[in-house]
Amino acid sequence: LVASNITVNTSKNTVLNGAIFTDYTIDSTGKSSRLDLALTDNSTWNMTQNASAKNLWQGSEAEGNFVTDLSLNNSVIKFGHLDWNNDNELLEAQKAENFKNLYVAGNYSGDNGQLHMNVVLGKDDSATDKMIVGGDTSGTTYINFKNIGGSGAQTAQGIKVIEVLGNS
């Protein structure tokens, strides 16, 4: 294992499709890999799936898309779509276990950024796409939710779609 550092800066109307995975395993020198992602000028990341590999996140194994630092400047992340059958029911393969997770180990900044997320509007523990930021957040980001079959319900704590472990 060799730690590497990658920075991806997109420009006008760039489209990324798929999953992103950064291995945070610490190598023999005490370093881990970094992937800094900056989406700018109407760029889009279509997060079509969770990365198939699992990573350690806050001491526990987690499955999802992993980046180190993330910034959205007039750009959008679309947390994929869920498929329905002809009876307006979720296909079995598209149920709660297939919602997307985005882990940002470091900091997140938004400058007119957008997140398009899927959520079942129901109780506190409703299935949802999630974004978890290990560091700090700053700026302005708009979140668009698509209700995936939820009929609404009383919540005590709300449905957690974004969690920030640092300052916000």
Set out the residue ranges of the language-model regions:
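Extracellular beta-solenoid/beta-roll
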Residues: 1-140, 146-147, 151-168
